[in-house]
Amino acid sequence: MNTSCLVTGGSGFIGQHLLANLSRHGYSPVVLMRRISEFPMLCQRVTELGGNARMLSAVQGDLSQPGLGLDTAAQRQVAACATLFHLGVQFAWGLSLAQARTVNVEGALRVARLALRNDARLLMVGGYMLCNAQHLARVGVRARQPELTDWPAVYRRVGGYEGSKLEAHYRVHAEMSLGGGALTVVHPATLCGHTQTGHMLPGQPFAELARQLSERRLRAIPGSSQHWLPLISVDFLVELIRLAAFDPQMIGQSLLALDARTPNLHGLVQALAQVLQVRPPQRHVPMAVLKALLALPGLPNLLQVEPESLDFIQRERFDLSQTNAFLQRHKRDWPAIEQAIGASARYLKATFYAAS
């Protein structure tokens, strides 16, 4: 069996845990890195996460460059990879259409073309919003005929980051279908930390919610008692990604990685506040009111809330029958999401918010 695989976005939160998981299970990940000088530091992080850094290697490349910026030697090394994991994105709020498309859309297409050229299987990480048909219709995505979607209008409605993730999904599907490639997509919910250690990186939406609570900036809970922020622990997500990538039955399929037992947003805030030892808000602010306030100049900075982030807070529930069948086939059970939430809050408090 060919154990070599290419990983984009390996330096990110999911990427670090995926490299640890793959290397721990005998795979040999090749990491695409813009700054290859940071590879030793990445190896150290992978070791700390329980991986085998000796299984890792790196090639210099860039998602924003033609041909991924690979030189001849790197192309030969990548050509030996039977599986490509595409996690690399530019994540930031307030991205322009051009900024978001450069890496998140064009970069994804470059990875897809590399997979087709090398006859490699592609595992792409999408997002759970792509599994919400009502949301897609609301923001103007023509899911059945995506080529007819007015993408600039979608970007204006949901922001550059989410717009580019949506567009990349449909563009890559079309590219792989046209070329007869093997594609599997995993759609993760919002990430919380490792189930046991709580490890996570700052800047994640879950971590930002904890930060707002820790700094006592969260005065009211967005939405209503029906709203929730669907979660998945990072360790279980990367386990699902690895299993899906090497499952022949998952070629041409997608997998929703979302824990339906995630508490509603009120319950999540209460659980975080208990660990952080702060008084949680009890009142709700209607989503429409909050979005209207955030449309006022200067309010997002004052409240430290990004308007784009509100779309991830949902009322809709999701069909997990395919996911549960996948787990049953692989003899896996959902880990306790309450444990992951508590461990994540403790890790964030000890690592980043101790002085708050």
Positions of predicted regions on the chain:
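Amphipathic terminal alpha-helices
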Residues: 318-356
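NAD(P)H-binding glycine-rich loop region in Rossmannoid oxidoreductase-like domains
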Residues: 51-56, 60-106, 114
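Terminal hydrophobic/aromatic helix or amphipathic segment near a protein terminus
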Residues: 265-317, 334-338, 353-356
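Glycine/proline-rich active-site loop of Rossmann-fold NAD(P)-dependent oxidoreductases
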Residues: 179, 194-207, 244-255
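Active-site Tyr-X1-5-Lys
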Residues: 154-184
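Conserved Rossmann-fold NAD(P)-dependent oxidoreductase catalytic core, especially the SDR/UDP-sugar
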Residues: 83-86, 106-160
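A conserved pocket-lining segment of Rossmann-fold NAD(P)-dependent short-chain dehydrogenase/reductase
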Residues: 152-156, 208-236, 240-244
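N-terminal Rossmann NAD(P)H-binding glycine-rich loop of SDR-like oxidoreductase domains
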Residues: 5-27
